[in-house]
Amino acid sequence: MVDRKRARELASEFLRKGDPTGWFEVLYKEGEAGKSVVPWADRGANSDLLEFWNAHPQPTDGKKALVIACGLGDDAQQLAAWGFETTAFDISETAIRMANKRFPKSAVKYSVADLFQPPAEWERAFDFVFEANTVQALPVKIREQAIQKIAAFVRPGGKLLAIVRGREADEPLGELPWPLTRTEMNEFVRAGLTEGSFEEYFDNEDPPARRFRVLYTRL
């Protein structure tokens, strides 16, 4: 079972201060120092991404990909290995520094950036955008804005793969990570994307977590 205690403590602390994203840098710093666990830093590509790709490989030749909140870089490295010209960003300077240190010869362009204030040149600039576990780490009140920002990275004809924890609307939100409802996921459609496939399943975590894995396209 993954230890999320410190992540939850920091998230609560920063939410009380009105800073819903400041805790990520603190957690990565503590993780680098061996003082805390970064729950999502598996040091391997996302298994749900790999499973999707094995079943639904996407064209990569001459295509540009973007990884949202890339952390230590494993998913970005995987997309680059599949052939994408890959950009990856995180709000945590420590995470990006660690990614560059782990992959010093990487072709991935790693950047420190804020999802809510991204570089203007990224708007509608990518053929494939990968989002996993970011929105579920944000409070409900800013999720709509986060989803709109993520959708805006997808160029016409491009695709977005989103993998999140899922729940029914009448189920409690619970603790971080906070699962999303189908209604919340539909915000990607309201942001201009078209839902291509929707998968619901339980993953291999202990205990298993309910997941939504959704592929969107900008027509």
Please identify what each model-predicted range represents.
Residues 130:
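A conserved beta-strand element that flanks and buttresses the S-adenosyl-L-methionine
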Residues 1-67, 71-122, 138-219:
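Class I (Rossmann-like) S-adenosyl-L-methionine-dependent methyltransferase catalytic domain
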